[in-house]
């Protein structure tokens, strides 16, 4: 399997990499949060742009991105607008969503963008090509905060992301039972062993699914999300605890 290298970080080998999400409503809070996050132990900074109030002002959005880049220049920066339909804070049109991601790509400030699989096939393919032409990596994602589909469907979505040339396919699902967590882990393992030619990220959410956030190295998930302050999704644990467990499992 090929790995993905962003800055000096190699994703897809060794212990899962830790991603933290920064969710700030304005420039002042972006700055203060960035200073607080700078001391935390993580690998990738995800900026959840859907929490940013002044979204219609592209200059303001990019000014915030510049603050993050300058505060943590060594950390890979993942630019994510999570749509309302996939658990995000704001609903915007597909056109606005694509334009926002293109502006982030054009800025030269971000290393990766998150692109939702179900945005529309043509728009997704075009945006992936645009990102790659500007040396920006794509995490292609799908989130279901209500249920976990069958393993075959999980694998089909991850394979579709791969066929669309995502650098890293990602799926996050809500379990209704412990067996749903096993379904996610089974699908992850099968994808990783039989189909994946690049790193994937998978997780089962909430307290029920927390094992999936810890056992990525065993089942084939290359990264996991931790919380510096407020969790960005149900089931996230603190980055310090997360690093401890990931290291124990890696060294065992």
From Swiss-Prot:
Keywords tagged on the record: Amino-acid biosynthesis, Aromatic amino acid biosynthesis, Lyase, Schiff base
Reactions performed catalytically: 3-dehydroquinate = 3-dehydroshikimate + H2O
Positions annotated as active site in the UniProt record: 143, 170
Keyword Amino-acid biosynthesis found: yes
Enzyme class: lyase
Chain sites annotated for binding 3-dehydroquinate: 21, 46-48, 82, 213, 232, 236
One Pfam family linked to the record: DHquinase_I
NCBIfam families linked to this entry: aroD
Protein name (Swiss-Prot/TrEMBL): 3-dehydroquinate dehydratase
